[in-house]
């Protein structure tokens, strides 16, 4: 058997546990399924597993120019009148090319369309019986999670011993105890939890400015009217009297300045 030099060395070399026998002449004998089987012949076209296809020699007309046509492009004119780029090799006069076709003359209509025609599978009943068997029962999800937490699973072993694989069910977040209470101690935006020992509120951070309503949260270019109204509202409130005390003082000053002239006109 001629040795193929392109096969890598780790494939050609026999392992240490393979005993030397009659197949020493076959340098790839340790890859055969059966000892002394030899190399398989792939010269015959085969598809699938042990499918025997019978081929016969066929022929078909070769593409070329017709008689009396241009030898450069094959059109119906002389070569001297051709406007295409000259070919390095002139087009042939055609002919026949031989190839192999599948012998289907003696086959029926169904056999021609049967891809597995000619295949005798002794393992077909075993495959059909295995397909008819019900699938194995799926593993309980709770048992799988428990094994994963205990580190018995291969994935948990790869994850590492220091890091827990799955968060325990009894491990409850601390801020969830105060969600239903009257006051919420956890700020989800800043991720800050105020414990029992904290007195009062934490000082406002610069990055949290505007969240407590101390500043106007809007865009000036998008709504300039809102900014103008927000500026005028405090000034307008400062000018207007607040409460009954300021209203009485303003009335007394008006009576002292103008007297009862308004009543005398009536």
UniProtKB/Swiss-Prot annotation:
Domain of life per record: Eukaryota
One example of a Gene Ontology biological process annotation: mRNA splicing, via spliceosome
Annotated GO MF terms: pre-mRNA 3'-splice site binding; zinc ion binding
Keyword Mitochondrion: no
Compositional bias (Basic and acidic residues): 173-194
Compartments (UniProt record): Nucleus
Keywords of the record: Metal-binding, mRNA processing, mRNA splicing, Nucleus, Spliceosome, Zinc, Zinc-finger
Ranges of biased composition (kind: Low complexity): 195-207, 244-257
Region span, Disordered: 160-266
ZnF (CCHC-type) residues: 68-84
Similarity section: Belongs to the SLU7 family.
Self-association state and partner proteins as the record states: Associated with the spliceosome.
Purpose: Involved in pre-mRNA splicing.
Protein's name according to its UniProt entry: Pre-mRNA-splicing factor SLU7
Source organism (scientific name): Eremothecium gossypii (strain ATCC 10895 / CBS 109.51 / FGSC 9923 / NRRL Y-1056)
Record lineage: Eukaryota, Fungi, Dikarya, Ascomycota, Saccharomycotina
């Amino acid at each position: 058997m001629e040795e193929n030099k392109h096969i890598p060395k780790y494939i050609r070399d026999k392992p240490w546990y393979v005993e030397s026998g009659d197949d020493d002449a076959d340098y790839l004998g340790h890859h055969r399924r059966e000892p002394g089987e030899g190399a398989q012949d792939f010269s015959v076209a085969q598809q699938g597993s042990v499918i025997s296809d019978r081929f016969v020699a066929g022929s078909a007309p070769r593409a070329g120019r017709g008689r009396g046509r241009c030898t450069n492009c094959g059109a119906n004119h002389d070569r001297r009148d051709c406007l295409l780029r000259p070919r390095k090799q002139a087009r042939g006069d055609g002919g026949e090319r031989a190839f192999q076709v599948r012998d289907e003359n003696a086959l029926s209509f169904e056999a021609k369309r049967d891809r597995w025609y000619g295949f005798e599978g002794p393992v077909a009943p075993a495959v059909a019986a295995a397909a008819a068997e019900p699938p194995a029962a799926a593993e309980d999800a709770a048992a799988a999670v428990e094994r994963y937490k205990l580190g018995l699973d291969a994935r948990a072993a790869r994850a590492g011993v220091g890091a827990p694989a799955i968060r325990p069910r009894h491990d409850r977040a601390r801020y969830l105890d105060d969600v239903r209470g009257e006051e919420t101690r956890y700020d989800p935006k800043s991720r800050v939890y105020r414990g029992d020992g904290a007195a009062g509120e934490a000082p406002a951070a610069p990055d949290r400015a505007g969240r407590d309503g101390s500043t106007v949260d809007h865009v000036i270019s998008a709504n300039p009217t809102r900014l103008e109204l927000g500026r005028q509202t405090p000034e307008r409130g400062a000018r207007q009297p607040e409460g009954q005390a300021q209203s009485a003082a303003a009335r007394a000053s008006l009576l002292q300045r103008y007297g009862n002239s308004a009543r005398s006109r009536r």
